[in-house]
C-alpha cells in the first residue's frame, strides 16, 4: 500500500537536493513517511538515481544500463506486471518502468568505496526523546537473517510426527498386476507406434456418446488422490500396448512407469484440452482434467492444507498458479498443430522416454534411446507411406518445440522443489517419493 504525502513534507530518505546538514537543521519537522518502490510497488529503500525505489530495482537499472546486454524483449506486448508470484516477470517492462519514473544513468557513481549493506537506524534515547518517536523497527528479513520468501520456514512450527503419510504400495501393486497381465484387448498393428496410438484411444476410457462434463470447483486431498490414481493406472494400461516395453525386466518397467506417468499426463491433458476447445466441449478459458471433468484455473479453489501448514500467500514462490502449472503457453501451438493420433502418440513417447533417460542415465538411457530410435522410424514410415509427406521436417519441429516447452518447465520447477525440500515446507510423506519427483 502506498501512502500519499504532501510535496512540502520532508522525507526520511536522503535526496541529492538536501544536504545532511540541512536535514539536521530541520530535524524537528521530520515526518516519517512510508514509501513503496515506484517500479515494482514493493517496500522502497530510498532515492536511487532520481526515483524512490527498492534496492533490487536500483541494482537492476544499474546492471541494465552498464551491462553488455541492454536490449530486452517482452512476450506480452509491453504490458507485464513487474512483480508477480514472488518474482520479477519481464526485464523489458521493468526497464521501461525505471525510465518512466525518472531513473537517470547520469547519476551513477563509479570508483568509490563500497557502502555496507547493513542498515543502521538511530536508536539512542536522546534521538527518540528529540523526535518524539520510538525506534524504527528492523525488518523481519533483517532480524531473522533470511530472505523474505523463507522467513516463515521455522522448523518448530510442526514436528515430524504431524506429517501426513500417503501409502502408495497398493496403487503400485495394481499397476504391477496390469503390466504382468498385458493389454486388455489384443490389437493388430504394423508397428509399435501404430499399436500405441490404438491403445491410447482405448485407455482414455471415454464412454461412447457421453458429452456430460463436470466442472471441478475445488481441488483438495480427495480430488488429488483420485486424479493421481486414475492417471497412474492409465499410463500403466497404455504401456501394455508397447511390445518393446513388455520385453523389459519387470523392475525396469515399474521404474519407468513411476518416472514418466506425470510427464505423460501433462501433455495428454493439454492435448485433450486443445481437442475439447476445438469441439466446443469446454470453454476457451477452461482446462480439461479428464474426459468428463473440467476446471477454470482462474476460479478453482486450491486446498494446500493437506500437504503444507503454510498459507497459500506465503507459498507463491514455490507453487505456480493452476494455469502456469498446466503450461497453458503450449496450448496455442498444440491447438494450431492439430496432431493426429499417431503424431500425439509419438510426442508422448518422445517426451516420456527422453525425460526418463535424462533422469536416470546408464542402462535406462540406453533403453529409452533405443525406444526413441525405433519409434522415430515408425513415424517416418507413417509420413512417407501413409500421408505421402516426405518433407515433414517442419511439422516434426513444431511437435518437438511443444515437448521442449514442457521439458523446460520441468527443469525450471526442479530448483524450487529442491528448495522446498531443504526448508521442509511440506507436511506430507510418500511411501514411494520417487513417483513425485519433478511433479512441481
UniProtKB/Swiss-Prot annotation:
Q: Does the keyword Transit peptide apply?
A: no
Residue ranges annotated for the NR LBD domain, each copy included? 184-439
The protein's matches in SUPFAM superfamilies, at most eight in alphabetical order, are given as: Glucocorticoid receptor-like (DNA-binding domain), Nuclear receptor ligand-binding domain
Q: Which PROSITE patterns match?
A: NR_LBD, NUCLEAR_REC_DBD_2
Q: Where is the protein localized?
A: Nucleus
Q: Does the keyword Cell membrane apply?
A: no
Q: Name one Pfam family in it.
A: zf-C4
Q: What does this protein do?
A: Orphan nuclear receptor.
Instruction: Name it.
Output: Nuclear hormone receptor family member nhr-130
Amino acid at each position: 500500500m502506498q501512502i500519499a504525502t504532501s510535496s512540502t513534507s520532508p522525507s526520511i530518505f536522503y535526496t541529492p537536493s538536501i544536504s545532511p546538514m540541512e536535514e539536521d537543521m530541520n530535524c524537528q519537522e521530520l515526518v516519517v513517511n512510508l514509501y513503496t518502490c515506484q517500479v515494482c510497488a514493493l517496500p522502497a529503500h530510498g532515492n536511487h538515481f532520481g526515483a524512490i525505489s527498492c534496492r533490487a530495482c536500483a541494482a537492476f537499472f544499474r546492471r541494465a544500463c552498464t551491462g553488455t546486454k541492454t536490449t530486452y524483449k517482452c512476450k506480452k506486448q509491453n504490458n507485464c506486471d513487474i512483480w508477480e508470484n514472488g518474482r520479477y516477470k519481464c526485464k523489458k517492462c521493468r526497464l521501461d518502468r525505471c525510465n518512466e519514473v525518472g531513473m537517470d544513468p547520469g547519476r551513477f557513481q563509479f570508483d568509490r568505496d563500497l557502502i555496507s549493506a547493513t542498515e543502521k537506524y538511530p536508536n539512542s534515547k536522546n534521538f527518540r526523546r528529540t523526535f518524539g518517536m520510538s525506534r524504527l523497527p528492523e525488518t523481519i528479513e533483517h532480524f531473522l537473517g533470511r530472505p523474505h520468501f523463507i522467513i516463515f520456514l521455522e522448523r518448530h512450527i510442526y514436528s515430524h510426527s504431524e506429517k501426513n503419510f500417503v501409502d502408495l504400495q497398493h496403487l503400485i501393486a495394481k499397476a504391477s498386476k496390469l503390466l504382468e497381465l498385458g493389454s486388455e484387448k489384443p490389437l493388430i498393428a504394423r508397428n509399435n507406434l501404430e499399436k500405441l496410438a490404438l491403445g491410447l484411444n482405448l485407455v482414455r476410457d471415454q464412454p461412447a456418446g457421453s458429452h456430460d462434463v463436470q466442472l471441478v470447483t475445488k481441488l483438495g486431498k480427495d480430488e488429488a488422490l483420485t486424479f493421481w490414481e486414475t492417471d497412474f493406472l492409465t499410463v500403466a494400461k497404455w504401456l501394455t500396448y508397447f511390445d518393446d516395453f513388455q520385453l523389459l525386466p519387470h523392475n525396469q518397467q515399474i521404474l519407468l512407469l513411476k518416472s514418466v506417468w506425470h510427464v505423460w499426463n501433462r501433455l495428454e491433458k493439454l492435448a485433450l484440452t486443445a481437442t475439447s476447445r476445438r469441439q466446443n466441449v469446454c470453454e476457451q478459458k477452461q482446462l480439461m482434467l479428464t474426459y468428463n471433468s473440467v476446471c477454470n484455473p482462474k476460479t478453482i479453489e486450491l486446498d494446500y492444507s493437506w500437504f503444507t501448514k503454510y498459507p497459500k500467500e506465503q507459498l507463491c514462490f514455490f507453487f505456480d498458479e493452476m494455469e502456469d502449472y498446466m503450461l497453458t503457453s503450449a496450448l496455442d501451438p498444440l491447438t494450431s498443430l492439430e496432431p493426429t493420433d499417431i503424431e500425439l502418440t509419438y510426442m508422448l513417447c518422445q517426451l516420456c522416454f527422453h525425460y526418463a533417460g535424462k533422469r536416470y542415465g546408464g542402462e535406462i538411457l540406453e533403453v529409452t534411446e533405443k525406444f526413441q530410435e525405433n519409434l522415430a522410424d515408425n513415424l517416418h514410415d507413417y509420413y512417407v507411406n501413409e500421408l505421402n509427406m516426405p518433407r515433414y521436417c517442419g511439422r516434426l519441429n513444431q511437435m518437438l518445440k511443444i515437448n521442449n516447452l514442457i521439458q523446460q518447465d520441468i527443469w525450471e520447477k526442479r530448483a524450487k522443489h529442491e528448495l522446498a525440500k531443504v526448508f521442509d515446507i511440506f507436511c506430507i510423506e510418500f511411501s514411494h517419493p520417487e513417483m513425485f519427483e519433478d511433479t512441481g
